[in-house]
């Protein structure tokens, strides 16, 4: 059994992580931390876990995280980087669901996240946890940077086209919509029911902090710079991301065949039949990414539709998938969950 600690178990990604680990046959949850709720039974805060998670929240100081095999950080940005060195030196592997280790250029990270990086020397060794791209490096990772929700949907949608070099890399467009759970569990005006319900809006058009992460991933696939326009939107749903991606083909290619061949051995990427339109509810509560690729009117413009659950494949599920790879387990352990419908 893998001895697991979870730092920050009270947010949406935290409880989703606990839901998945509670049914994982090789997971032994030994500590779940919360500074503000130490002493409270986890199932009192999250009744959905009653009978499956019998631990109480503890403070980070009382968690004995150095005795774990792996520690997940389901915390705000800036927390994992403060504890990473101590854990790594103790031989503990670390999976960060926040953004502390995603961007390799520390100066760029500090610009977008507005804080000084506490462990810049560890950034270079962190492995970006997109299994469909970095599976072999994930196996030996000591520090795993779990991708963001928007970056996961966008990169999986563009990956076959960019890897194959069949699109104009100077002008990629990602038009992406997210449910309100992507903003986290904290109280903010824009996610109040009266503000978000019956409403739909774009935001951060001038620049979203996931932009450099997406661009970094696409450039690694392409082996050169890319031009990317990324516009996120907030929709009145709880969970789900729908990415509509646009690129111009630089060569004539059967895009349906390209996607099917690239993802034929990927457990969690489902390439839909030609002409399909994936829906967010078709992946809800699952670790699936469903994609469909179109060439409207047979033109040289390719449109990719990519949907994920932002809390699962966009966060906790992908983190568990990476843990399975890191510990040489079946990649689907704990993740063989059918989407919830309706």
UniProtKB/Swiss-Prot annotation:
Keywords noted in UniProt: Amino-acid biosynthesis, Arginine biosynthesis, Cytoplasm, NADP, Oxidoreductase
EC number: 1.2.1.38
GO MF, one example: N-acetyl-gamma-glutamyl-phosphate reductase activity
One Gene Ontology term from the biological process aspect of the record: L-arginine biosynthetic process
UniProt keyword Nucleus, yes or no: no
Catalytic-site annotation from UniProt: 149
Annotated PROSITE patterns: ARGC
Main location per the UniProt record: cytoplasm
Catalytic activity, as annotated: N-acetyl-L-glutamate 5-semialdehyde + phosphate + NADP(+) = N-acetyl-L-glutamyl 5-phosphate + NADPH + H(+)
Pathway: Amino-acid biosynthesis; L-arginine biosynthesis; N(2)-acetyl-L-ornithine from L-glutamate: step 3/4
Compartments, record wording: Cytoplasm
InterPro entries, per database record: AGPR_AS, AGPR_type-1, NAD(P)-bd_dom_sf, NAGSA_dehydrogenase, Semialdehyde_DH_NAD-bd
Keyword Amino-acid biosynthesis applies: yes
Record-stated family: Belongs to the NAGSA dehydrogenase family. Type 1 subfamily.
Purpose of the protein: Catalyzes the NADPH-dependent reduction of N-acetyl-5-glutamyl phosphate to yield N-acetyl-L-glutamate 5-semialdehyde.
Protein name: N-acetyl-gamma-glutamyl-phosphate reductase
UniProt gene name: argC
